[in-house]
């Protein structure tokens, strides 16, 4: 951006003095002049494009003097409006500040450029109808929107500009009305929600009052029927019954432990376990019936609230009894399983001992039979020896033994001594068994 004096450009309008301060309504715009940005300050709502051109030319002449290259009058130049590839020459009387504000959010994409009229268009746009127009040989539908706008007459271009301003104003109005409608909808929604919340709070207060009345009525009825201390009695009775049940359970546990220590109460434990199981089933069925009855009675009047409280206390006591009986049953079941394991172990030991006893009995019987056979054979051999000695003959058995003995003594291997030892041990065992 080339340096130049802002104060100089601020005072280049026709109806303003150089020493007058800038009003708070004054604005500024950027105009491209010879590929440089020039800031034009002091714009008002009455400033036109020809005023901006005059200020730019005066500033250029004051800056460069005789070396200036923007020659000619202000009417020989025009300001071109460029936006996203399209461009349009502004008429001299265009309110430049109004046009700049109308672009709104598209201001960063829009530029003002100072060009010479003859270089931009063959014929200026603001001349009268007496000026001879050059015919364009190109077809209108083959031209770009910017070039097509250049071919239009000035009055039609003015109408298009006015129409564009009206459309922009309408768009702004529509957006503002849409925002207002959204805000109104939100306000109505908040008000309706606040109203519903107040109604719900009021209804809750009414229900609380009705509940308090019903409770007071039930309290008076209970005082008339059961006395003034019915609450203490209702809470003290279950405690005494619970203590008695605890004592009963402790005595039953001690008894079951004694029975287990004796080892003779397995059948009794099974019976007790069956009894507790039946009791558990019975209590569970009663609890289910009570729960169903409580569910059906929930839709009745508030007069049965006291009965429901008693039933709830009974249900709680029954649940406590059920839990205690379940614990006792689990203890008994654990003791019973331990006893069964011990019985199985003792049975296995007895079976092993019985098998050992049978094996020992078989061995003993076999040894006894062999000892009897040995004794009988010995007696028979004695009788035969006596008979042979009386006849003077040597029995063949002794002869064989003698021969084997002589043969063994002649051997050098030493096996005879081993055979003799084995024979002696076997004979000694036989004699011992015989005795």
From Swiss-Prot:
Keyword match Coiled coil: yes
Localization of this protein: Endosome
GO biological process: endosomal transport; intracellular transport; protein targeting; signal transduction
GO CC annotation terms, alphabetical: cytosol; endosome; recycling endosome; trans-Golgi network transport vesicle membrane
Gene3D superfamilies: Phosphatidylinositol 3-kinase Catalytic Subunit, Chain A, domain 1
Region (Disordered): 1-22, 371-423
Polar residues: bias regions: 400-423
CDD domains: RA_RASSF9
Coiled coil regions in record: 195-291
Sample GO molecular function, one term: protein domain specific binding
UniProt keyword list: Coiled coil, Endosome
Record flagged with keyword Membrane: no
UniProt domain Ras-associating: residue ranges: 25-119
InterPro entries: N-RASSF, RA_dom, RASSF9_RA, Ubiquitin-like_domsf
Tissue specificity remark: Testis, kidney, skeletal muscle, liver, lung, brain, heart, pituitary gland, adrenal gland and ovary.
Organism domain of life: Eukaryota
Compositional bias per record (Basic and acidic residues), positions renumbered to this chain: 375-386
Principal cellular location given in the protein's record: other
Assembly and oligomerization: Interacts with PAM.
Name this protein carries in UniProt: Ras association domain-containing protein 9
Underlying gene: Rassf9
């Amino acid at each position: 951006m080339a340096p130049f004096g802002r104060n100089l450009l601020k005072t280049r309008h026709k109806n303003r003095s150089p020493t007058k301060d800038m009003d708070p309504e004054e604005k500024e715009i950027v105009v491209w002049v010879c590929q440089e940005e020039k800031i034009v300050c002091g714009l008002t709502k009455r400033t036109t494009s020809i005023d901006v051109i005059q200020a730019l030319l005066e500033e250029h002449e004051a800056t460069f003097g005789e070396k200036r290259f923007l020659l000619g009058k202000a009417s020989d130049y025009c300001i071109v409006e460029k936006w996203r590839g399209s461009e349009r020459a502004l008429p001299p009387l265009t309110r430049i500040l109004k046009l700049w504000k109308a672009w709104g959010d598209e201001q960063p994409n829009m530029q003002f450029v100072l060009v010479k009229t003859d270089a931009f268009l063959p014929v200026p746009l603001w001349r009268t109808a007496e000026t001879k127009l050059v015919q364009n040989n190109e077809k209108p539908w083959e031209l770009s929107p910017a070039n097509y706008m250049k071919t239009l007459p000035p009055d039609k271009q003015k109408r298009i500009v006015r129409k564009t301003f009206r459309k922009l104003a309408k768009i702004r109005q529509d957006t503002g009305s849409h925002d207002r409608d959204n805000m109104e909808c939100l306000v109505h929604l908040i008000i309706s929600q606040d109203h519903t919340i107040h109604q719900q709070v009021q209804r809750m207060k009414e229900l609380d009052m009705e509940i308090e009345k019903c409770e007071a009525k039930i309290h008076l009825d209970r005082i008339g029927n059961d006395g003034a201390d019915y609450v203490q009695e209702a809470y003290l009775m279950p405690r005494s019954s619970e203590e008695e049940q605890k004592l009963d359970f402790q005595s039953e546990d001690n008894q079951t432990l004694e029975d287990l220590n004796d080892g003779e109460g397995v059948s009794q434990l099974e019976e007790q376990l069956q009894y507790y199981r039946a009791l558990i089933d019975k209590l569970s069925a009663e609890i289910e019936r009570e729960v169903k009855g409580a569910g059906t009675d929930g839709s009745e009047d508030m007069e049965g609230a006291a009965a429901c409280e008693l039933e709830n206390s009974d249900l709680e006591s029954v649940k406590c009894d059920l839990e205690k009986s379940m614990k006792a049953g689990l203890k008994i079941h654990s003791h019973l399983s331990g006893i069964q394991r011990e019985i199985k172990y003792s049975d296995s030991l007895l079976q092993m001992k019985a098998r050992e006893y049978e094996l020992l009995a078989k061995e003993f019987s076999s040894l006894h039979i062999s000892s009897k056979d040995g004794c009988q054979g010995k007696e028979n051999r004695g009788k035969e020896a006596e008979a042979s000695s009386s006849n003077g003959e040597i029995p063949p058995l002794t002869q064989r033994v003698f021969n084997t003995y002589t043969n063994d003594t002649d051997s050098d291997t030493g096996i005879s001594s081993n055979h003799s030892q084995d024979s002696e041990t076997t004979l000694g065992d036989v004699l011992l068994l015989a005795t």
